């Protein structure tokens, strides 16, 4: 199954993959070679740590390659949804209880990072937003309780 992902998200994953392959993998190979040179491998903590790190890096490389091969890349800048909220939209919300504004972009599950304002398409927040427009009110059931928001702005920024 294809997983939707923004162009920016795909670039970030490709950059990480390239870094792992061209920088981290050679570093670990050198660390293993150095540790081997120290002799007995049974009690060589450096060797075992380097092998463990190699295993982690190789696993992450495989994971990234798999994610990228299943990504359906969506160029947010080319979307023409107007003020309607769809995948890729950057939405400004006003909390009707506190008047605080927050801004989120709806992205694929693999690129979500709430600290950066990136919410997964499958999240309760995104599900409540999809199909809404500027001026609409949404209700989100959060762990802290029920929150009501107004959609202040909808943008499509790449």
Swiss-Prot record:
Any one Gene Ontology molecular-function term assigned to this protein's record: DNA binding
Keyword Ribosomal protein: no
One annotated GO biological process: DNA-templated transcription elongation
Keywords, alphabetical: Coiled coil, DNA-binding, Transcription, Transcription regulation
Coiled-coil residues: 45-72
Name of one Pfam family that matches: GreA_GreB
Gene3D superfamilies linked: Transcription elongation factor, GreA/GreB, C-terminal domain, Transcription elongation factor, GreA/GreB, N-terminal domain
Entry similarity comment: Belongs to the GreA/GreB family.
Function recorded in the entry: Necessary for efficient RNA polymerase transcription elongation past template-encoded arresting sites. The arresting sites in DNA have the property of trapping a certain fraction of elongating RNA polymerases that pass through, resulting in locked ternary complexes. Cleavage of the nascent transcript by cleavage factors such as GreA or GreB allows the resumption of elongation from the new 3'terminus. GreA releases sequences of 2 to 3 nucleotides.
Stated name of the protein: Transcription elongation factor GreA
Annotated organism of origin: Xylella fastidiosa (strain Temecula1 / ATCC 700964)
Gene name per UniProt: greA
């Amino acid at each position: 199954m294809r997983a939707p992902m923004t162009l920016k998200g795909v670039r970030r994953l490709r950059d990480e993959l390239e870094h792992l392959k061209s920088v981290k993998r050679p570093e670990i190979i050198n660390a293993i070679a150095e540790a081997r040179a120290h002799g007995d491998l049974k009690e060589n903590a450096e060797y075992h740590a380097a092998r463990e790190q190699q295993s982690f890096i190789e696993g992450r490389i495989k994971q990234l390659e798999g994610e990228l091969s299943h990504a359906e890349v969506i160029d947010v800048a080319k979307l023409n949804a107007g003020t309607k909220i769809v995948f890729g939209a950057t939405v400004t919300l006003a909390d009707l209880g506190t008047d605080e504004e927050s801004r989120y972009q709806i992205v694929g599950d693999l690129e979500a990072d709430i600290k950066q304002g990136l919410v997964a398409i499958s999240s309760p927040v995104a599900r409540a937003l999809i199909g809404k427009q500027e001026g609409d009110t949404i209700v989100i059931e959060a762990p802290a309780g029920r929150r009501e928001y107004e959609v202040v702005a909808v943008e499509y920024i790449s």
